[in-house]
Structures are given as structure tokens and as C-alpha cells.
């Protein structure tokens, strides 16, 4: 009787490994813990960034389609007040690129004011490929960090460009209590 039971479940050789493997797979995928909910500060940060990106996207679609640089700069300046409210006294920067990652405009303008080519940046490549909001931390030469959020500008299903916001990690920590781990865990697409 015992050998009949063993053969019916484990085969003629009595091998138990397929059953153990199946149980391990079920336990591995079925018992994973869920991500912890966002802290109130991280939730506020997400809400404010998404709101700013939505306002920027609506304002920038036509100027980016027409590659109207003065109008793009004017649109960024118009959105400045909500963006400044976004992070009072934070050094922030907003940028707009075309669909390949070449910079069309940056606000506030810094340095020579000339457009840079960000097409080789991993964050830009991911945002272009996925057509979803992507984020990344970026280290500056002085060792400080920026939190970068890059969102696609879509007209229908067509990618026309990207809009990006950079916020100092130090100021984000002061304003929202946002840690690097929390920033990287935020899903800006939900």
C-alpha cells in the first residue's frame, strides 16, 4: 500500500524533488510581503510633483510640438509660481527635451543657457522607452544629491518630448522628510 501511494504521487522512483520544488515556488511567490505605504511626507511629495508635472505637460504640449523655444521658456516661467510653491526655497530646476533627449529649455537658466544633450542619460532613455514617469538620484561633483523625475510629454500615443524636475535631496528631506529609500520607492505612475 505504501509503495502504491508513493508511486502515484512521486513516480516509480519515489522522487520527491518535483513536489518540493512546486511547494517552494508556491511559498516563494505566494508569501511575499507587500510594500509599506508611503509616509505622509513622501505622499505629499508625490502629490505635489505629479501636480506640477501635470500642469507642465498641459502647458508644454503645443510649444514642444511646434519647437517654439520662446513659448516653451514662457510656459516654464508661467509654471514657476506653482513649482516654487512646490518646494519653497528649494533649489529646483525644470527642463524640457525633445523626443530624442536634446534639451529645448531649462528653467531657471543656469550657466551658459545652451541646451545640453541628455539622450545618453539612463533616466532619459528609460523614460523615452517606457513612456512612463521615471525617477533617479543623481550625484553632483560636490557629493550632494539631486532627485530627478522625468515624465514623457505625450500627444495621444506619440512621444513629443520629456519634462523633468530636479530637487535637491537635502531640501526634500527638510521640506518633506523624504529619504532616498522613500524617493526611490515612490511610483509616480500610480
Residue ranges of predicted features:
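Helix-start (N-cap) segments at beta->loop->alpha junctions
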Residues: 154, 165-180
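Extracellular/periplasmic ligand-binding regions of membrane signal-transduction receptors
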Residues: 43-75, 99-104, 109, 181-190
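A short beta-strand signature within small-molecule sensing/ligand-binding domains used
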Residues: 143-152
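Core beta-strand residues in small-molecule sensory/regulatory alpha/beta domains
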Residues: 97, 153-154
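Extracytoplasmic/periplasmic sensor domains and loops in membrane signaling proteins
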Residues: 69, 73, 108-139, 178-185
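Glycine-rich acetyl-CoA-binding "A-motif" of GNAT/NAT acetyltransferases
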Residues: 159
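C-terminal motif of bacterial Sec signal peptides marking the signal peptidase cleavage site
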Residues: 29-30
